[in-house]
């Protein structure tokens, strides 16, 4: 591998590493979406919520004298209560989430995220082994694993987006306002870096095609 191509590979691997870190942050945190109800009475309290792939957290916030009828922002101080989703931890209760959205959505998003982490692990193993002499070919399966991981993150993001939409549209929930949090942004950035980084790594790791017919003859091994 030439020095120019090796430099491109290192830069691409660094971008993929950033994508891996962002994917891990998105999976383990619970700020994918922030939900708030409509505030009818001023100088009272309202209950906002934020959730991720594994748990939901609600916060009771004091509402001040404001023309804004929404609850929040979520960063305001208040009584906080977090619980893991019932289908992941039977010992915990999360009735709000269980009632207001479909269990299949959260299970699907979490399962696909786990598949993404699995592809990341396989890609990292191949990438580390490729640093040994004459094992540059392992960069190709590593690139595919990273691209697949990015696609899984994208699917998980889309499933979570549909889950939030169903929660807002449901008549059984008090949530009427929502916005996506920083965990969601980390997941979107991870998708871009992993998918595009995987494609770029595949292109950079491919052997150079001969421009002229005689170049392939010159590169051929001599017969004994």
UniProtKB/Swiss-Prot annotation:
<protein>
    <recommendedName>
        <fullName>Voltage-dependent calcium channel gamma-1 subunit</fullName>
    </recommendedName>
</protein>
<comment type="subunit">
    <text>Component of a calcium channel complex consisting of a pore-forming alpha subunit (CACNA1S) and the ancillary subunits CACNB1 or CACNB2, CACNG1 and CACNA2D1. The channel complex contains alpha, beta, gamma and delta subunits in a 1:1:1:1 ratio, i.e. it contains either CACNB1 or CACNB2.</text>
</comment>
<dbReference type="Pfam" id="PF13903">
    <property type="entry name" value="Claudin_2"/>
</dbReference>
<keyword id="KW-0107">Calcium channel</keyword>
<keyword id="KW-0812">Transmembrane</keyword>
<feature type="transmembrane region" description="Helical">
    <location>
        <begin position="182"/>
        <end position="206"/>
    </location>
</feature>
<dbReference type="GO" id="GO:0070296">
    <property type="term" value="P:sarcoplasmic reticulum calcium ion transport"/>
</dbReference>
<dbReference type="GO" id="GO:0005245">
    <property type="term" value="F:voltage-gated calcium channel activity"/>
</dbReference>
<feature type="topological domain" description="Cytoplasmic">
    <location>
        <begin position="207"/>
        <end position="224"/>
    </location>
</feature>
<keyword id="KW-0813">Transport</keyword>
<keyword id="KW-0472">Membrane</keyword>
<comment type="function">
    <text>Regulatory subunit of the voltage-gated calcium channel that gives rise to L-type calcium currents in skeletal muscle. Regulates channel inactivation kinetics.</text>
</comment>
<feature type="transmembrane region" description="Helical">
    <location>
        <begin position="137"/>
        <end position="157"/>
    </location>
</feature>
<dbReference type="GO" id="GO:0005886">
    <property type="term" value="C:plasma membrane"/>
</dbReference>
<keyword id="KW-0106">Calcium</keyword>
<keyword id="KW-1015">Disulfide bond</keyword>
<feature type="transmembrane region" description="Helical">
    <location>
        <begin position="111"/>
        <end position="131"/>
    </location>
</feature>
<keyword id="KW-0406">Ion transport</keyword>
<feature type="transmembrane region" description="Helical">
    <location>
        <begin position="11"/>
        <end position="29"/>
    </location>
</feature>
<keyword id="KW-0851">Voltage-gated channel</keyword>
<dbReference type="GO" id="GO:0005246">
    <property type="term" value="F:calcium channel regulator activity"/>
</dbReference>
<feature type="topological domain" description="Extracellular">
    <location>
        <begin position="158"/>
        <end position="181"/>
    </location>
</feature>
<dbReference type="GO" id="GO:1902514">
    <property type="term" value="P:regulation of calcium ion transmembrane transport via high voltage-gated calcium channel"/>
</dbReference>
<dbReference type="GO" id="GO:0030315">
    <property type="term" value="C:T-tubule"/>
</dbReference>
<comment type="similarity">
    <text>Belongs to the PMP-22/EMP/MP20 family. CACNG subfamily.</text>
</comment>
<feature type="glycosylation site" description="N-linked (GlcNAc...) asparagine">
    <location>
        <position position="43"/>
    </location>
</feature>
<dbReference type="GO" id="GO:0042383">
    <property type="term" value="C:sarcolemma"/>
</dbReference>
<keyword id="KW-0325">Glycoprotein</keyword>
<keyword id="KW-0407">Ion channel</keyword>
<feature type="topological domain" description="Cytoplasmic">
    <location>
        <begin position="1"/>
        <end position="10"/>
    </location>
</feature>
<feature type="glycosylation site" description="N-linked (GlcNAc...) asparagine">
    <location>
        <position position="81"/>
    </location>
</feature>
<dbReference type="InterPro" id="IPR004031">
    <property type="entry name" value="PMP22/EMP/MP20/Claudin"/>
</dbReference>
<keyword id="KW-1133">Transmembrane helix</keyword>
<keyword id="KW-1003">Cell membrane</keyword>
<dbReference type="InterPro" id="IPR005421">
    <property type="entry name" value="VDCC_g1su"/>
</dbReference>
<dbReference type="InterPro" id="IPR008368">
    <property type="entry name" value="VDCC_gsu"/>
</dbReference>
<feature type="disulfide bond">
    <location>
        <begin position="57"/>
        <end position="82"/>
    </location>
</feature>
<dbReference type="GO" id="GO:1990454">
    <property type="term" value="C:L-type voltage-gated calcium channel complex"/>
</dbReference>
<keyword id="KW-0109">Calcium transport</keyword>
<feature type="topological domain" description="Cytoplasmic">
    <location>
        <begin position="132"/>
        <end position="136"/>
    </location>
</feature>
<dbReference type="GO" id="GO:0051649">
    <property type="term" value="P:establishment of localization in cell"/>
</dbReference>
<feature type="topological domain" description="Extracellular">
    <location>
        <begin position="30"/>
        <end position="110"/>
    </location>
</feature>
């Amino acid at each position: 591998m030439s020095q120019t191509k090796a430099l491109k590979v290192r830069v691409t691997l660094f971008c993929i590493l950033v994508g891996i870190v962002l994917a891990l942050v998105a999976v383990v945190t619970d700020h994918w979406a922030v939900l708030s109800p409509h505030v009818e009475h001023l100088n009272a309290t309202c209950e906002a919520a934020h959730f991720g792939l594994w748990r939901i957290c609600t916060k009771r916030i004091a509402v001040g004298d404001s023309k804004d009828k929404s609850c929040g922002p979520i960063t305001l101080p208040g009584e906080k209560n977090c619980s893991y989703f019932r289908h992941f931890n039977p010992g915990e209760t999360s009735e709000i989430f269980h009632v207001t959205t479909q269990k299949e959505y959260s299970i699907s998003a979490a399962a696909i995220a786990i598949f993404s982490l699995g592809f990341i692990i396989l890609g990292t193993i191949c990438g580390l082994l490729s640093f040994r002499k004459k094992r540059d070919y392992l960069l190709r399966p590593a690139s595919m694993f990273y691209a697949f991981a990015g696609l899984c993150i994208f699917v998980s993001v889309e499933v979570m987006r549909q889950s939030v939409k169903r929660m807002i549209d449901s008549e059984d929930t008090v949530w009427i306002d929502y916005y996506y949090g920083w965990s969601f942004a980390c997941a979107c950035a991870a998708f871009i870096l992993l998918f595009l980084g995987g494609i770029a790594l595949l292109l950079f790791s491919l052997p150079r095609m001969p421009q002229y017919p005689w170049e392939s003859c010159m590169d051929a091994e001599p017969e004994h």
